[in-house]
């Protein structure tokens, strides 16, 4: 059963460790990450970008696939299904589709508009039992074709967003999506310290976890980071393993062209990457019970949600 990411991240923040968000792109990605999390007895957050959601034919398909896979694989560790860098409209669609957590990325809006939209989504997400992540200070690099220069967040703006009742906050501190260039200056810990002072005990999120040195990761955790996102590293390991399989001609041996065999090395490479991350301090897991959302409670949430927010759904073309 899917759970909100709120409790797992609050416990990570208090325990000074971090939970990993690994983005999924298809069935192989999802299966590999879930099986590895179960093997390691570790909670996990499955991130889904809007581009990946579209690739998998829509958020409803993603939610159904993940929920069914959790059941069929007998996954018992806490799993959150989380929209990554969601638009205002995308957040509504994921709420309706059955996600258990959403991220609204309003960092490209003027702060006043970011506050207004975040405030509305907080009320709706919480009415449905979902956790909500917000962002201040755009993350650099490329995400689904959108290239951001990256900037450091304003601690005062972080406090304004945090005070809206969000569950965790992504603050730009010099981190970027994708591969880090050779001239990257590293994480800005002065900004992170000031953000921590401004938002108190709120769990912080570090996007662009691929390629950040372990010592920086550990320091970031000591300053309040409780969720670290990884996507590019899994993609690179999948591509390298698949390339090796083809270059060695294994796809031409027997029925090596069968997709179940062709994609297997890449799937195993994803497992190895997730294990590697879970083996570091930043993904240390303590065996804690995470509250799950019961079906009866979900029905109650949905009734309340429809009563209070029908006009918002109608306005966004979701009814």
Residues covered by each model-derived region:
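N-terminal amphipathic alpha-helix/helix-capping segment at the start of soluble metabolic enzymes
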Residues: 1-20, 67
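Alpha/beta enzyme core
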Residues: 5-9, 27-51, 59-76, 88-200, ...
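Low-complexity, intrinsically disordered or signal/transmembrane-proximal segments
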Residues: 292-295, 300-301, 309
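Short hydrophobic targeting helices and cationic amphipathic motifs
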Residues: 304-313, 318
């Amino acid at each position: 059963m899917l759970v909100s990411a709120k409790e797992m991240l609050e416990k990570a923040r208090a325990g000074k460790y971090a939970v990993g968000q690994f983005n999924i792109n298809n069935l192989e990605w999802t299966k590999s990450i879930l099986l590895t999390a179960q093997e390691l007895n570790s909670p996990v957050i499955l991130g889904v970008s809007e581009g990946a959601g579209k690739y998998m034919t829509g958020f409803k398909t993603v939610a159904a696939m993940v929920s069914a896979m959790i059941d069929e694989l007998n996954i018992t560790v806490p799993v959150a299904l989380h929209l990554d860098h969601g638009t205002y409209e995308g957040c509504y669609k994921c709420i309706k589709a059955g996600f258990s957590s959403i991220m609204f990325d309003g960092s490209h809006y003027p702060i006043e508009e970011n506050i207004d939209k975040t405030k509305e989504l907080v009320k709706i997400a919480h009415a449905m039992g979902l956790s909500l992540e917000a962002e201040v200070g755009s993350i650099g690099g490329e995400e689904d074709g959108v290239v951001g220069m990256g900037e450091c967040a304003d601690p005062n703006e972080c406090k304004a967003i945090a005070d809206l009742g969000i569950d965790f906050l992504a603050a730009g501190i010099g981190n970027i999506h994708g591969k880090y260039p050779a001239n990257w200056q590293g994480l800005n810990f002065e900004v992170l310290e000031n953000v921590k002072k401004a938002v108190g005990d709120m769990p912080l999120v570090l996007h662009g976890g691929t390629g950040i040195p372990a010592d920086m990761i550990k320091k970031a955790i000591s300053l309040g980071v409780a969720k670290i996102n990884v996507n590019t590293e899994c993609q690179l390991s999948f591509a390298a393993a698949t390339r090796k399989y083809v270059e060695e001609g294994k796809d031409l041996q027997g029925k090596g062209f069968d997709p179940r065999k062709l994609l297997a090395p890449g799937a195993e490479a994803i497992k190895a990457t997730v294990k590697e991350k879970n083996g570091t301090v930043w993904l240390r897991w303590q065996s804690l019970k995470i509250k799950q959302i019961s079906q009866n409670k979900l029905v109650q949430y949905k009734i309340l949600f429809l009563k209070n927010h029908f006009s918002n759904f109608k306005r966004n073309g979701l009814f």
